[in-house]
Amino acid sequence: MSLTMKNVEGFVIFLVIFTSTAAVPQLQKALDGREYLIETELKYNWHQAWHECARHDQQLVTIESADKNNAIIDLVKRVVGKSHNLWLGGNDEYSSSRDYGRPFFWSPTGQAFSFAYWSENNPDNYKHQEHCVHIWDTKPLYQWNDNDCNVKMGYICEPNHFRETYDQALKQKCEAIKITNSKISTEFDQLHAKQSLEFDSITQNVAKVNEDWKIEIQKLQNATQIAIQQIMENHEKKIRDLSDNLLKQLQDSNEQLKQSTDHMNASFGEKLKGQQAENNEIC
């Protein structure tokens, strides 16, 4: 049965998708709590492996302690099974020395090795061409070997140290900003509460002064009214007393006038009567 062009195209698309999916290594969590990316299917030289890690925002792994080495060995056992050729992040900066004790450095950090897990008689810099470090598949204990950096093999990546340091510093800075903002917010709330209390106190004092002022004004008005009333009463009493005195004087004057008139009339009547009697005697 012949394949049609459509079938061929479908097969090619499936193959591309399958290959792309299979080629993406997955992060695996180790006993130390860190996540590592292990590539065993596709092969790269050391520099290509470095760039592959960078594409995933990672770096070739650095192993600074026995604990970290044991965690990675345990992870490789669980994920891969047996020992594999896997690039690590170390190299000797292309030293020409074949001395086993020549210095090696972790390229992601620039730090010299403080821990190593070399296989027997290594690092030997065979033919002066072995400058990059890897886990060796010929050693069941997952020991290290120096090899030509152009040899292709798998690799192990870990989170970028500088990115982690930057993220940690950024996180600490953000936390510090949050603490500062929280402190400022707390201080503002406390100041606002204090000002509110002071404003309430001032408002209450103003209200009290206003109330006291009203009371004093009322007292003054009452006192003024009482004083005016007293003055009016005293004035009325003086007028009444004066009127009564004038009336009494008038009555006394009338009485005196009456008495004087009566006396004058009586005296005049006596004189007139005597004169009449005299006239009668004469005439």
From Swiss-Prot:
Keyword Signal set for record: yes
Name of protein: Lectin subunit alpha
PANTHER family recorded: MANNOSE, PHOSPHOLIPASE, LECTIN RECEPTOR RELATED
Functional description taken from the UniProt entry: Role in the defense system of the organism against microorganisms. This lectin binds galactose.
Highest rank taxon of the organism: Eukaryota
S-S bridge residues: C53-C157, C132-C149
Pfam families: Lectin_C
InterPro entries: C-type_lectin-like (IPR001304), C-type_lectin-like/link_sf (IPR016186), C-type_lectin/snaclec_domain (IPR050111), C-type_lectin_CS (IPR018378), CTDL_fold (IPR016187)
Sequence intervals crossing the membrane: none
Induction / repression: By injury of the body wall.
Organism: Sarcophaga peregrina (Flesh fly)
C-type lectin domain span: 51-159
Signal peptide region: 1-23
Nucleotidyltransferase is among the record's keywords: no
Record's keyword terms, sorted: Disulfide bond, Lectin, Signal
Molecular functions (GO terms): carbohydrate binding
